[in-house]
């Protein structure tokens, strides 16, 4: 398939963020009557879910400490629930089983969940936690547990299947996905705005560019000549930390374990 030399929207990265942006943008353009998925292309230097989205754990949860994310995560869980078969989504819920050191933080998460009507159960105290866990796993043996946060929505997804389904949904709306296309640079107009994307297969003019490159975001940050360091204001005392590196990468290795499917079955057989 020939790559167009112009597209209103260009999305860089065919992982969860890039494909989700493409699909939902296509739906929004159509619903407003101002365009369609045909106005969108997605570029990836390898292919759909070739990066982090293809090896991530696939857990779907609303268990984050930042309160600003709470409603966004609740919304996202509903998206997974909207088509569980296509997204290979298993709504088994999510549990955070914690020691005392994490008790207060987890309690805060629970309070934030209740404030937006997100269904969850919070159990406190060693005896009650042990009783609750043994009600699910009769052979539960973990010690030192003082809190259990049990989210009823959520679960996990087989991520590669989910990404392929999401790509198909986007393409069904007219989005074009191009694999094996590496972005090498950007062109700017006289006002300094990005006007075109330079790729290994030619230049593409565009009105809007979305960078959804996951772990490669730092590379594009450098391409755009953005600052290597930033200043951050402390939320507690207002002090300013200067020259903080914009990007710090940690090494995380994930994989798949082959286990007996009957291992760790709950009391009700699930």
Language-model-detected regions and their locations in the chain:
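A short, basic/flexible loop-to-alpha-helix module at the beginning of a structural domain
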Residues: 1-6
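N-terminal Rossmann-like FAD-binding beta1-loop-alpha1 element of flavoenzymes
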Residues: 7-41
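Conserved Rossmann-like nucleotide-cofactor binding loop
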Residues: 17, 48, 216
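Flavin-dependent oxidoreductases
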Residues: 20, 61, 186-193, 198-270
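Short, well-ordered alpha-helices that flank and scaffold nucleotide-derived cofactor binding pockets
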Residues: 23, 27-31, 164, 168, ...
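Conserved FAD-binding subdomain of flavin-dependent enzymes
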Residues: 24-28, 39, 45-120
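Flavin (FAD/FMN) cofactor-binding and adjacent substrate-gating region
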Residues: 81-82, 101-179, 184-193, 198
